[in-house]
Regions:
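Short beta-strand/loop motif that positions the catalytic acidic residue
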Residues: 407-409
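Alpha/beta-hydrolase fold nucleophile elbow
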Residues: 179-190
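A catalytic-pocket lid/entrance helix-loop region that shapes and gates access to the active site
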Residues: 198-200, 205-311, 445, 459, ...
Length: 591
């Protein structure tokens, strides 16, 4: 019951070198204030929108239909295709439009239409249906990568699909309401986060406010070296996984025992995993291996390589960041299957990109994690693809001159290391200058959060409300309060533990698409790539208590004030850590 003990203990460790200064006691946050905009009614019937010619706006032949959708929040639904094959959808309120437009990104390799304004707590324009919504499938159907042979579809996925959908949506807004939107927003996570940054970099005038969550900004590296390394390390000589789900229980408990208290509080989550110096040898089996109790010498070696990240034989770091200490319970969603007969999702993530999207022409002999070269030369060979897909250009001065950017990431993200976001934030400061960056950009890091949501830590927060309030009232968010409802110890909501061999997931890994391998409802009826333990292999059925925690704008962190419940945000104050070197040293650092 170590996990339960760790979660209920709360202690102060005195003055830690981690913190340079402490802010005064936290006070109630000011209410978020958005602009008061007069509701606007349509100036034409919904059906008449279908008579418009959008080719002039999108720059390509565009076909679409327009249909009224009844309900508590009725809207005009426009569904269409922008040549070559960008399917898009726009929802325009039939009454009470408050002059705002929100476009949402897609996850994985996209391939389906799903408007998902997530993290909308407290965002009235979204919750009351008074905002125009739009999204695109990024130019192809299905979450596979078979379309990768087509150069136009590669470009659509890389950046064009989002942009032309934006152009179409804005043209529809102007025609339907007789005026343009007052504010335009974009929000996405995972690949949607990459899409968000791509908009800021390539089309800085498209949006006034952008929220980029866990962005797959180093797309080619992420889906070649990162996932390839994870798959290779966790595949034994017999072709079976070295680590399986039961091994995560003692590993994660040992990490928490070693590093949970570094911030002065033992609360079941690690505030800054960069400070954790953990050696998995502390749980090396002293006798025979027993699943769920200890690790073999081989498993210890694999865990060390997983924490270290992809390297060449010369020792060159081939990626910005690897798995962070404290993320172990999230590894099931990519490269640690439930049993030794399970598949390693990271293998599929890697092969989908390397064999279908990275090279022209595609490799004659497909790569696997066992045959893909982890070399400097292979990184160089992927440069053309990096320039196409990756949203790693830190020169976003044109966007920052008028817009606002919220960058956010979970510290326990197993698919995209939060070190990518930290590095990008630092490089924007070098390019634009810290004054311009700090006036228009914020980074928020969430302890214990997995990929886009979930995990041990609080992961639901008013993202869109904060973004809109910043853009419309000019008040930058200094903190956001994140919440965690009651959930099981592996980060799943209460009531769905044991739902099947493929546990429910949110956000989806970078190459799994909305439904993971197997489509919108994968083999387990949910996201197949986000594997959870099957019945009979669960950790003890403990329930983590509801928790709220302030998340302060980077580099500040939350520190327990010494009074009140550790599950109450009011018990925490802002602390400024000692400075860290945030620009990563790796093979791509010179770009």
């Amino acid at each position: 019951m170590l996990r339960r003990l760790l979660l209920v203990m709360a202690m102060m460790a005195g003055s830690l070198a981690l913190f340079a200064t402490l802010a005064p006691a936290a006070q109630a946050a000011e209410p978020l204030r958005m602009a008061s905009l007069a509701p606007v009614a349509p100036v034409m019937p919904c059906a008449d929108l279908a008579k418009l010619d959008l080719a002039g706006a999108t720059g390509a032949p565009t076909t679409f239909t327009a249909t009224e959708v009844a309900g508590a929040k009725p809207y005009c639904q426009v569904s269409g295709t922008i040549a070559r094959a960008n399917r898009f959808e726009v929802r325009l309120p039939l009454g009470g439009w408050t002059q705002r437009f929100l476009q949402t990104g897609c996850g994985g390799l996209c391939g389906s239409l799903r408007i998902d304004p997530g993290k909308a707590e407290g965002c009235t324009p979204v919750t009351d249906g008074s905002i125009v919504l739009a999204s695109t499938d990024m130019g192809h159907s299905g979450n596979g990568s078979e379309w990768g042979e087509n150069a136009d579809q590669r470009t659509d996925f890389a950046y064009r699909g989002v942009h032309v959908t934006t152009l179409a949506a804005k043209a529809l807004i102007k025609a339907f309401y007789g005026q343009a939107q007052r504010y335009a927003y974009f929000s996405g996570c995972s690949d949607g986060g990459r899409e968000a940054l791509m908009e800021a970099q390539r089309y800085p005038q498209d949006f006034d406010g952008i929220a980029a969550g866990a962005p797959a900004l180093n797309f080619t590296v992420q889906n070649s070296f990162h996932h390839g390394w994870l798959a290779k390390q966790n595949t034994g000589a017999d072709g079976k996984p070295v680590l399986t789900w039961p091994d995560m229980v003692p590993l994660h408990a040992a990490v928490l025992k070693s590093c949970d208290g570094l911030d002065g509080l033992v609360d079941g989550q690690i505030t800054d995993p960069r400070l954790c110096r953990f050696d998995p040898a502390v749980i090396l089996c002293k006798a025979a291996y027993e699943a769920g109790k200890c690790l073999t010498a081989t498993q210890v070696a694999v865990v060390r390589k997983i924490y270290d990240g992809a390297r060449s034989a010369k020792g060159t770091k081939l990626e910005i960041g690897a798995e962070m200490p404290g993320s172990e319970m999230e590894w099931r969603s990519g490269f640690v299957p439930s049993t030794r007969d399970g598949r390693i999702g990271s293998e599929m993530f890697m092969t989908s990109t390397v064999n279908a999207l990275m090279f022209t022409p595609n490799p004659k002999t497909p790569y696997s994690s066992a045959t893909m070269p982890f070399t400097e030369a292979f990184y160089a060979a992927g440069e053309p693809a990096r320039k196409l897909y990756s949203a790693d250009d830190a020169d976003i001065s044109r966007f920052l001159a008028h817009g606002k950017l919220l960058l956010w990431h979970g510290w326990a993200d197993p698919h995209i290391s939060p070190m990518n976001s930290i590095d990008y934030y630092a490089r924007v400061g070098l390019k634009a200058g810290t004054a311009q960056r700090d006036a228009a950009m914020r980074l928020f890091l969430f302890p214990g959060m997995g990929h886009c949501s979930g995990g041990d830590g609080p992961s639901e927060f008013p993202l869109l409300a904060n973004l809109m309030a910043w853009v419309e009232s000019g008040k930058a968010p200094g903190r956001m309060v994140a919440a965690r409802a009651g959930q099981t110890a592996e980060g799943l909501p209460v009531g769905i533990r044991g739902a099947g061999p493929n546990g429910p997931g949110a956000g989806g890994p970078p190459l799994a698409g909305p439904g993971g391998p197997g489509g919108p409802a994968g083999p387990g009826g949910v996201q197949a790539a986000r594997q959870g333990p099957p019945p009979g292999m669960m950790p003890p059925k403990e329930v983590l208590p509801p928790r709220s925690r302030p998340i302060f704008a980077y580099p500040q962190v939350a520190r327990y004030s010494g009074k009140g419940s550790v599950d109450d945000a009011a018990s925490f104050v802002a602390a400024t850590p000692a400075p860290t070197k945030d620009v990563a040293v790796w093979i791509g650092a010179s770009r």
